[in-house]
Amino acid sequence: MLDTQKYNALDLAQPTNFRAMLQSGELLWGTACRIPHEEAARIIATLPHHFCFIDAVSALLSFKSCEKLNGKVKEHAPLNATLLASLIKTVQYTSNGSMVPYVRIPEHSSDLVNYALNAGAGGIVRPHVQNVQQARDFVRLAKFPPLGGRSYPPMALFGRQTRTAKGRTVYDVWNEHAAVLCQIEDVEGVKNVHDIAQVPGGISGPHAIQ
């Protein structure tokens, strides 16, 4: 069985090499944190799974949140950046790097890409990718130059958190370790699947397509 910790960076503040894990050919087991609360994430992180899916698109609301809707029950809502970063770090640190947090990002929330990756997410997923340009734009947001246009975060890591192998930088680690996944779940996306597949990192949403 694959050992996730062998794919860890030199510090848990940096993302685990989820790309290499996905390309290893080994069977990976995953779970999901559907309750957007640090305590739920802490409990889930004790499980023996390889990765944990955190859905920033349609997180379940707490009972307290539902009460504020004046009797109108709303099943889900997007996560805010602070809670998202906290869930990612909780999974990463509580599991001691044995479970990779990866996140589905809302289509029009490019700022959450930075928050998720800066927090240490091993991968990000964009829903409803319909054409190659959307896929390229998503990769550009997630990768530092020369692979993309992501802005360098000067305050994301401090001290020992910046440790890397000789000749490497934390930006190399982010570029090489974080998986960028495109979720295809529309007719237009299926029509353009061959072009989208040319962009590194692709995953289809079979349940959505059905």
Where are these regions (language model features)?
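N-terminal amphipathic alpha-helix/helix-capping segment at the start of soluble metabolic enzymes
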Residues: M1-A32, T164-E176
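Conserved anion-binding
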Residues: D111, A119, G123-Q210
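Short, acidic/polar
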Residues: C33-L47, E107-Y115, V187-P200
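Hydrophobic faces of well-ordered beta-strands that scaffold small-molecule active sites
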Residues: L28-C33, C52-I54, M99-I105, I124-R126, ...
